[in-house]
Amino acid sequence: FSPSTTRLESRVRELEDMLDLERDARVRAERHAADMSFQVDALSERLDEAGGNSSQTHELLKRREMEIGKLRKDLENANASLEMAETSMRRRHQTALNELAAEVENLQKQKGKAEKDKNSLIMEVGNVLGQLDGALKAKQSAESKLEGLDAQLNRLKGLTDDLQRQLNDLNAAKARLTSENFELLHANQEYEAQVLNLSKSRSSLESAVDDLKRSLDDEAKSRFNLQAQLTSLQMDYDNLQAKYEEESEEASNLRNQVSKFNADLAAMKSKFERELMSKTEEYEELKRKLTLRITELEDTAERERARASNLEKIKAKLTIEIKDLQNEVDSLSAENAELARRAKAAENLANDLQRRVDELTIEINNLHSQNSQLEAENMRLKSQVNDLVDKNAALDRENRQLSDQVKDLKSTLRDANRRLTDLEALRSQLEAERDNLASALHDAEEALREVDQKYQNAQAALNHLKSEMEQRLREKDEELETLRKSTTRTIEELTVTITEMEVKYKSELSRLKKRYESNIAELELQLDTANKANANLMKENKTLAQRVKDLEAFLEEERRLREAAESNLQASERKRIQLSSEVEELRGALEAADRARKHAENEMNEAQTRVSELTMQVNTLTNDKRRLEGDISVMQAD
């Protein structure tokens, strides 16, 4: 069970105890009313006995007519004044009875209205209890969400550490790639110089081969001419015997030149083959080194790609978690707004209760002043009653009639007391409902403080992960503000309705009390026992004053709690502003990290581009080598 539920149960038990005390007080009041009725009956019997004694007094008066002759005139005057007083008293009693009947009807109507208001208040209390249960459930869900957020915060801290380590590794790889890039550029320059040298040697070899081809063509042509000449010489051998020796010498010279040229060609060919073999070996060694280097670079690039894909996956996971946390923050914001709305409603209720206490205090002061006036009037009437005791004998019949009227008025008074007791019970019920609302306000404020604390913790965790939360929070704040305004208007309308009902109840109760006190003042002319009712009224006033003091103490406590809640809200606002500044700083840090990551990705792409360019250059060199090998094989075949 939560602390709020325990406090609510204890409050319910206290209210049940108070209800039992009120029932006991009501039983005692009914017993007191029964005792009063018994005393009134006893007084009526005494009045009847006094009537019998008055007849004896009349007989004595007949015997002493001479002695009381002077008093007869006074008695007639007194009878006339008493008859006039009796008429006025009857008129007043009749008017009071009519007013009491009208008041009874009004009280019945007000009772019906009070029942309706009571039912509506009971429904509102049920709604408040339901909202309290919802707040408790929201509190439990917020606690579970807070635990989940703590776990996610720890996991995200681990992921942040991993990302930091990976960023350090990327920076180290970037530095290593930069140095390797410089080395590759230097090697590339050397390779370009070697390629230029090879191109120059190739061009020289090609020119030499062209010269050799031209010389071979010339030699082939000359050989063909020589063969034709030899054929013509063989055909003309017989005719040119004289010239045979010269031609033989020329042929031997030509053979010597051809053999010498063949020897020079073989030497040049062997020399070129040796140079080509050495260059080919150097090229193969360079190709092998470049292949190893390209393999290493490809492995490094593959590792970087895998790392980049892992980073993308981690980024996607973090994005999903940030969205989940955003949804949880939205729900916590809604719960916070709901609790703030309840705190506002409770504050309005406390203000209404304060106004009610002030009005009750004013009414109590008015009742005290009226009570003092009634006591003075009571003393004056008592003196007049003492003056008229001697003339009571002539009013026996009127006393009997007045006794009957007193009985009727007593029954009416008992009905009025019963209705007044019902109204007092209704007022105690309203006070109990007010206490329940006050306890609900206290619980709501405690839940608000707990949810505010959890909301601050969750906000601190979320501010390390997402920078776009401020816009959404502002939108949610606007929606919550509109919801708070509409709810506040509804609560104000309800408060106005309750206030009007209380004002009507107070006005009717005050009017009933005034009329009741006027009836008691009129009945005190005939019955001294009405002073006890006045004493009871004083006791009720004291009890009401004590209740007012209790209400003032309770309202003072409520005001102190409200001020504490306002200070807590101000502290929460300051923390929210501080967290907003931290969010801006974290946003700048995250943007700097994104820029560094993009820069590293650009450098990695540039390195991959350079590796691909080097691969293309190696392929070009390989193709050139193959072409040279083909040319050399063609030359060797020639």
From Swiss-Prot:
Protein source organism? Opisthorchis felineus
**Oligomer status and interactors:** Homodimer.
Coiled-coil spans are 1-638
What PANTHER family is this protein classified in? CINGULIN, CINGULIN-LIKE PROTEIN 1-RELATED
**What Gene Ontology terms describe where this protein resides (cellular component)?**
bicellular tight junction; myofibril; myosin complex; myosin filament
Q: Which GO terms describe its molecular function?
A: microtubule binding
Its lineage opens with: Eukaryota, Metazoa, Spiralia, Lophotrochozoa, Platyhelminthes
Q: Name one GO biological process term.
A: microtubule cytoskeleton organization
Keyword field: Coiled coil, Cytoplasm, Motor protein, Muscle protein, Myosin, Thick filament
Name of this chain's protein: Paramyosin
Relate the protein's function as given in its record: Paramyosin is a major structural component of many thick filaments isolated from invertebrate muscles.
